[in-house]
């Protein structure tokens, strides 16, 4: 098992199929939430060396994303105190008229409002991108199977991405996660944040490659709020080439 801390309130735990098998679990066990699944999650948390801010943090939510050869579990802690007070419960209305499902939906919404909303939004963005990838892959397979739908299109050779960071420390931490080849990278300073551009070579890659890479990038960054053209004209240029490589050399305290 591997664990990464995505933000102050979100962890990503990668569990291999072998790990699942050793614990008597299968992918189908995660299709319908049940007590067995919850016990598995907490047993995994007990085994890992959790960051201090996750220990005894109260309420946790788990989001499961099955992969071909593993299971990705995103764990988000709530900023709500471990003991929910009566004022919190009063916000839910008449609980006697709620089904258990409605109650937990209301509770989850309350957690989102009082917890790390940005982390939830980022996870949803990643999930939407991956859903688009699956749909595009199925569409391509369908077109390949039906010659009448084939048509010539000009493939992209390179794709530029723009990412935002609140602090330079976040940009350095992001750079250290890059373990794949990139063609170029730049760093700009905006009025209230830092912006990084990433250029990827997508030649000889499948059509969904660009979306998959974008999903990987925003695991540790925020989607860009400016275009590269805007930054070139209005941004303060800090590193015009090799920004990722230069930031990787910086040691974080």
UniProtKB/Swiss-Prot annotation:
**Cysteine pairs bridged by disulfides in the record:** none
State the Pfam families in the record: MecA (PF05389)
Query: A GO molecular-function term, please?
Result: protein-macromolecule adaptor activity
Give the matching InterPro entries.
MecA_C_sf, Neg-reg_MecA
PANTHER family of this UniProt entry?
Answer: ADAPTER PROTEIN MECA (PTHR39161), ADAPTER PROTEIN MECA 1 (PTHR39161:SF1)
Function description = Enables the recognition and targeting of unfolded and aggregated proteins to the ClpC protease or to other proteins involved in proteolysis.
Please describe the quaternary structure of this protein. Answer: Homodimer.
Domain comment in the entry:
The N-terminal domain probably binds unfolded/aggregated proteins; the C-terminal domain interacts with ClpC.
Please report which protein family the annotation says this sequence is part of.
Answer: Belongs to the MecA family.
Question: This protein is called what?
Answer: Adapter protein MecA
Write down the species. Answer: Streptococcus pyogenes serotype M3 (strain ATCC BAA-595 / MGAS315)
């Amino acid at each position: 098992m591997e664990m990464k801390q995505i933000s102050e309130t979100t962890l990503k735990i990668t569990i291999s199929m072998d790990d699942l098998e050793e614990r008597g679990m299968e992918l189908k066990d995660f299709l319908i939430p049940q007590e067995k699944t919850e016990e598995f999650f907490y047993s995994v948390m007990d085994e890992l060396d959790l960051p201090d801010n996750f220990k005894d943090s109260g309420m946790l939510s788990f989001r499961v994303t099955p992969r071909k050869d593993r299971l990705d579990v995103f764990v988000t802690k709530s900023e709500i105190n471990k003991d929910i007070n009566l004022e919190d419960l009063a916000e839910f209305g008449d609980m006697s008229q709620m089904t258990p499902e409605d109650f937990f939906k209301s509770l989850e919404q309350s957690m989102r409002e009082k917890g790390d909303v940005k982390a939830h939004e980022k996870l949803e963005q990643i999930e939407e991108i991956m859903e688009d990838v699956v749909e595009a892959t199925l569409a391509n397979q369908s077109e390949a199977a039906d010659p009448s739908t084939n048509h010539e299109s000009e493939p992209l050779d390179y794709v530029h991405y723009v990412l935002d960071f609140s602090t330079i420390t976040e940009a350095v931490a992001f750079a250290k996660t890059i373990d794949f080849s990139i063609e170029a990278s730049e760093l700009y300073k905006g009025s209230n944040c830092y912006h990084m551009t990433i250029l990827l070579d997508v030649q000889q890659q499948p059509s969904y490659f660009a979306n998959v890479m974008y999903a990987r990038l925003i695991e540790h960054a925020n989607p860009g709020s400016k275009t590269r053209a805007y930054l070139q004209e209005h941004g303060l240029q800090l590193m015009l080439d090799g920004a990722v490589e230069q930031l990787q050399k910086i040691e974080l305290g």
